[in-house]
Amino acid sequence: MPKVTNLNHRLRNIMKSKKTLLAIIIAVAVVAIAAVLLIIKPWGGNDDNSSSSAPDSSSVADSSTPDSSSATDVSSSEPEEPAKPLTPVDYYGEMKVVDGKIVGSKTNELVRVTGMSFFWSNWSQKYYTKDYVDYMVDDYGCEVVRCSYGVMDDGVPYDTSCEPLIEDVIEQAIERGVYVIIDWHSHGAHNNPDEAVRYFGELAQKYGQYDNVIFEVYNEPTQVLWKTVKEYAEIVIAEIRKYSDNLIIVGSPQWSQKVMNAATNPIEDENVAYTLHFYAGTHGKWLRDEADKAMDQGIAIFITEWGSVNADGNGAIAKQSTEEWFQWMDEKGISCCNWAINDKEEGSSIFVKDSNNELTETGIYIKELIKQRTDNAPWKKAS
């Protein structure tokens, strides 16, 4: 029966093939089901019988809510950054004139900050850098720096290429949390208010929202009537006020010494102070008396420039007179900036000519004075 035998043999082979195919199909199905189960519920999930080695429930996301607990766990495992120390601007905030005093908007306390003034920008560009801001803050202890944008007597800047450098100083002062005065450093600014309007308008738009920034619209008027200075200042102030309510400082006639002129006819703006300039080798009690009378009339004073030598920038350090001025400023709570960050061969420069930041006798003395004042500042005690 060969044909029957062959038929049986073929049937057995077909049955084996079907069984093999069925086994393969079953195996594939099992693998697929297992994969689906793993996707739906990761291995070792939230079963009541999970072992102690399973992940904590707080680290497993709930499908119905954001995984906030997981984010917390991750952040808590990272080392915490040390708290940043307070800076003068952190502590005081924006400077405001209230009842003839300059106070901090955050503390409502009298603000008394001390620092340095840069020299004329057109003659000292090498110092208008972020590194020198850091040097003044870290080495001298400055709470404020002053940018002196050099402007000719016709009211036109000597060199507009200085403007980006001044902005570098402004931005680094903001970064370091100290105040920065933007000074229109001229003896004849009233002759061309348009240039000042352009410049202060641009910077007020760019930096006027920062508490650090103070605008000084006229450094030192000389032999000019206060009426003329006031008219110029009002034009520039109106432009600044389009963008910023920050403190504005205005100079007065005779190299910013006739503050009584301003006191008897002040500018109508809620946040304006007036600058008084002194040089200890030349100016004494008579100028302090003038300032006292002006403050009694209700105006605020900020000494944006002072020197320990003669008014021409030369001469020896007048230590006794300087100490008398500082005692008076401490009693009145007046802020000040020393002249000047420069290496010109004159008594007021803090650096030796063409040196690598070697301090002059003046530089050493001024550094000690500033640090004595700022080391005991309220913002440091609050840190």
Task: Briefly describe each language-model feature range.
Residues A29-I40, S59, S64:
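Amphipathic alpha-helical coiled-coil/heptad-repeat segments
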Residues T129-G188, N192-R198, I237-Y243, A318-K332:
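Aromatic-lined substrate-binding rim segments of carbohydrate-active enzymes
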Residues A83-P164, H187-N191, F302, S308-G313, ...:
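N-terminal substrate-binding region of glycoside hydrolase catalytic domains
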Residues R12-A29:
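N-terminal Sec-pathway targeting helices
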Residues V36-S50:
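Hydrophobic single-pass membrane-insertion segments
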